[in-house]
Amino acid sequence: MPTSRHALRVSLVSGLLLVSACKKQEEAKPEGAAGKPAEATAPVAAAPKEKALKVGLVTDVGGRGDHSFNDSALRGLELWGAGKKMGGGSYKDASPEELKETLQQDLATRGIAPVAGVTPVVLQSKVPEDYEPNLQLLVDQGVGMAIGVGFMLENAVETVAKRNPDTKFLLIDSTLADAEGKPYTLPNVRSVLFREEQGSFLVGALAGLASKNNKVGFVGGMEVPLIKRFEAGFRAGVAATNPKATVLVNYTGSFDNVAAGKQVGQDLVTKGADVVYHAAGSDGMGVIQAVKEARAAGKPVFVIGVDSDQSHLAPEAVLTSMLKRVDLGVYEAVRDLAQGKLEGGDVTLGLKEGGVTYAPVRVEFPGKAEALQKVEELRAKIVAGELQVPTHPSQLPAAAAPAQK
């Protein structure tokens, strides 16, 4: 019957396939040195893949190249966090030596090293209207955290963070506030604040000791509470070491107008200030230029930089810089994000936490060694809680370095 013959053919073919398969299995068995089957070994685990982590950053209008606030934030993400440096419009690997040379001695033991897998994504803001769309663009690109650099991004960070609760955000220099101005927190937003008044106090104390005509100057950017902390600390520091000194105070009204900074700097030097401290973002580059030109013309004047060590801009003119370690705040957030430890809330960094300090004093002036010793004594008192630094000029005692515009 056709059905029986078909069944027989299927049976024969199946048997042949089975024999062939068994033979191949025997041939495929690994053998030991004596020709015997090798003993079974545990499977080799594949090397773990480096977890990719995109971290985004939105600058304020000062942007990259301000040699100050934004550049400090970029250093914390790009160099310290990712081990990268920007060159020719693209990232290149930075050497360990390049990272090390940006760390002051007090940071050498904090274990700062690139975080494996971090890729920076940076968007520069030309106008304030760029802040919110830039932050949202970072979220759309899949970043694990979006960083808003500066208090001017507060509203944008708040809006985008509420819209995207699964994305982490880092806000520098501001807390979130409700409609009544009361601070509050979101679970996906870390705010990093600094005790600028403490670092400003130290450079003010140094300015008071370095001044020869008892007249120093302060240049602020926008006249807002944040910059008032710089002014208050500086004036208190001057008064602590040189009660006879007068502090000339002026504001440029911006953070991105180098020409305005230079004009105000020239004005203060003309009025007799021989040490000028600026807290004015990119405007401060103009202040430094004004003092540099005054020194070239024979005037014994100094300038004090801010946020980053600005001595490279005018080595002979920069007395020191008040270091506000935005880079440290950014780096610690990147590290915590990678370790799954980033939580919402406010973090404040002062002298005790390494968040503020002053740069090495590379220039010479009479009494330098004694001046630095005095400044360090004042630092110790602040860290120990024995000396409280005012956070607003209204808190200064009546006798403390009266300000003149």
Predicted features, each with a name:
Residues 23-405:
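A residue-level marker of the well-folded mature domains of exported/periplasmic proteins
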Residues 18-21:
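C-terminal motif of bacterial Sec signal peptides marking the signal peptidase cleavage site
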Residues 1-11:
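Bacterial N-terminal signal peptides that target proteins for export
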